[in-house]
Amino acid sequence: MAVNYSAKEEADGHPAGGGPGGGATAGGGGAVKTRKPDNTAFKQQRLPAWQPILTAGTVLPAFFIIGLIFIPIGIGIFVTSNNIREYEIDYTGVEPSSPCNKCLNVSWDSTPPCTCTINFTLEHSFESNVFMYYGLSNFYQNHRRYVKSRDDSQLNGDNSSLLNPSKECEPYRTNEDKPIAPCGAIANSMFNDTLELYHIENDTRTAITLIKKGIAWWTDKNVKFRNPKGDGNLTALFQGTTKPVNWPKPVYMLDSEPDNNGFINEDFIVWMRTAALPTFRKLYRLIERKSNLQPTLQAGKYSLNITYNYPVHSFDGRKRMILSTISWMGGKNPFLGIAYITVGSICFFLGVVLLIIHHKYGNRNTSADIPN
């Protein structure tokens, strides 16, 4: 129903007078001021308004239309999600039978590093490009103090922030009277396990090529993260700084390739994008399909070699490796499809119930008989 309010020609609400001999005056002739709002449609709350009237003729079709739209969309998303290949290995080593159990109690400074190997079998081939992720559980990257513990100016290559990091980085701002680069708790806790994948055929191990470039967002790689400005090599540019406390080597030694070293190292950039939930995964490597005639990872036996550097047992965390393909909607996530199907089904069911009620009671006389 449309309800229109039109401003009528009315008095402005101010006291009459102001001319000679008319109206109240104060102190010799000024008009008495008033706090009453002006007589306008806006200030007097007379703007046009529209209010829908909910009838069976409008509500029932809306329920059925929503149901008929949401259910097919949900089925399509759910089927697409189920077609994504995914394989997950938990290599925390909590179980005594796990090959990585010997590495469970490693610390940040454990030398030599602990290594373990987990053999597994892929029942189905992975046809398209494969994405390798590492996953952590019970790790709260969304903690307020943790999220703030970084210096974006330093990470963007500002030379003054390099030698004088933000106080938000405390207690990982300086070490031994030298500024830490990169500073903060996020950088200090960077994931540093090394994962290697091998295909086993006829007792022969063949290394799977893992691509380490292209795993970070373009805007992060080219805009948010920059190395310090200067013409020298990274060792000279980072002179006067020290590495994070838990790192085994400084930031300018993260990679041998200049375009993937320092603050623009893609493993580092991926880690610095904090997760919203305590159980998360981050992209580690890419496995590209080399031939349209051969699957990227064919069904068969594989082994995962792990250099176990990252301690999680102290906070009851878990670590895992995930191999996954993707689709137009991203990675495997059945929740979205289930949500669409559920909402569509509820709307369709309510439409049927309300249609029955309307058919049974809609034509009854609603006027009340008042006895004499």
UniProtKB/Swiss-Prot annotation:
Topology, Exoplasmic loop side:
80-336
Give the region (Disordered) as residue ranges.
1-36
Which Gene Ontology cellular component terms are annotated?
apical plasma membrane; endoplasmic reticulum; Golgi apparatus; phospholipid-translocating ATPase complex; photoreceptor inner segment; photoreceptor outer segment; plasma membrane; transport vesicle membrane
Question: Which residues fall in a compositionally biased region of kind Gly residues?
Answer: 15-31
Q: What is the lineage of its organism?
A: Eukaryota, Metazoa, Chordata, Craniata, Vertebrata
Q: How does it assemble?
A: Component of various P4-ATPase flippase complexes which consists of a catalytic alpha subunit and an accessory beta subunit.
What free text does the record give on domains?
The N-terminal domain seems to play a role in the reaction cycle of the catalytic subunit such as ATP8A2.
Primary location class = membrane
Say yes or no: keyword Thylakoid present: no
The gene it comes from is TMEM30A
Per its UniProt record, what InterPro entries does this chain match? CDC50/LEM3_fam
* Described purpose of this protein according to its UniProt entry: Accessory component of a P4-ATPase flippase complex which catalyzes the hydrolysis of ATP coupled to the transport of aminophospholipids from the outer to the inner leaflet of various membranes and ensures the maintenance of asymmetric distribution of phospholipids. Phospholipid translocation also seems to be implicated in vesicle formation and in uptake of lipid signaling molecules. The beta subunit may assist in binding of the phospholipid substrate. Required for the proper folding, assembly and ER to Golgi exit of the ATP8A2:TMEM30A flippase complex.
Membrane-spanning residues where?
Answer: 59-79, 337-357
What is the name attached to this protein's record?
Answer: Cell cycle control protein 50A
Provide the membrane-side ranges marked Cytoplasmic in the record: 1-58, 358-372
Q: Which cysteines are joined by disulfide bonds?
A: C100-C116, C103-C114, C169-C183
Q: How does it sit in the membrane?
A: Multi-pass membrane protein
Organism of this sequence: Gallus gallus (Chicken)
Q: Which GO terms describe its biological process?
A: phospholipid translocation
UniProt keyword annotations, A-Z: Cell membrane, Cell projection, Cytoplasmic vesicle, Disulfide bond, Glycoprotein, Golgi apparatus, Lipid transport, Membrane, Transmembrane, Transmembrane helix, Transport
Subcellular localization is given as: Membrane; Golgi apparatus; Cytoplasmic vesicle, Secretory vesicle membrane; Apical cell membrane
- Return the Pfam families for the record: CDC50
Q: Which residues are glycosylated?
A: N105, N119, N159, N192, N202, N233, N305
Q: Does the keyword S-adenosyl-L-methionine apply?
A: no
The record's comment on protein family reads: Belongs to the CDC50/LEM3 family.
